[in-house]
Amino acid sequence: MIVLLSACQSVEKNTKLIAGTFNTATNIQMKMLDRFAPPDVIVHNNIPYQASPELNVDIYQPKNIEQLNAMPTVVWIHGGGWVSGSKEHARGYFKLLANQGFNVVSVEYQFAPEAIYPTQLQQVDHALNFLQLNAAQYHINPNQLYLAGDSAGANIASHYAALLTNPTFAQVSNFKPSIQPKQLKGLILHCGIYDLYRFVNTAPEELRLIEWGVYNLVQAYTGERKEDAEFLKSISTSEHITPQYPSVFISGGNKDFLTKSQSLPFVEVLKQHQVAVTEAFYPDSKEFLVHEYQFMMSKQASQITFDRTIDFIKQTSRPTETK
């Protein structure tokens, strides 16, 4: 089935179809989240962090930012299967986070297949460098940074953290991070992908459309190297964890196939390397928690996850934190 479907159209055409579907869902999600957004959060839209191609960040801040000291900053990498999405996709959620006393920076990056791995990681690094250089202007504490992401964004965030904290991985990847490991206080990961080889080989076969989608997304992101098992393993976050990896807050829905195939195995890898992990999973919940459930703020589990995220940032940003 996969071969037949893929033979009908190119990866480029297929990913455009997938991106259109994802963007429709994203727009609905954005409008729903806007209902929960506090009205008086300060927003700086479309601040350029890279000139060619021009890419921007949005910065969300509490209304009393001028009276506050430099604050912890959550740098959010949006999802969309590496082929779609927008930095505005969860703006209501970012306002909720900012209203709790943090900076939130949402990063724009280029999409596959026009821009393939590792372009997105390089662009995240450029964004972090920009924030570091302009920290004073935006009340950012450059030593209290958090990388956050949902879905493919969680993949990018977790991968960047591995490059930052594993010098061998960075060297073989020819990657020189702009920040130091001690500056990254933690990761916030929702519904992510941490093992690309496993992602390709555990897509539910009974759901042919999902299997077809996984095939095309990975082909797009990797430059059509989906069949190269060793390459997929070599760029999987789970293969490069060390005890120096930052503290992790990780969540996934009870009806998201990625929870069982990606998030839970990743938690085990983190624990094997003595990485501090805060988990937010709800296997016994009666709520139907699908992919990206954390943005569905009308659900009790989503509210709990949000509250625990705030606690995670507060606890890990204390001066006594050593990671």
Tell me what each language-model feature is.
Residues 8-323:
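Alpha/beta-hydrolase superfamily serine-hydrolase fold, recognizing
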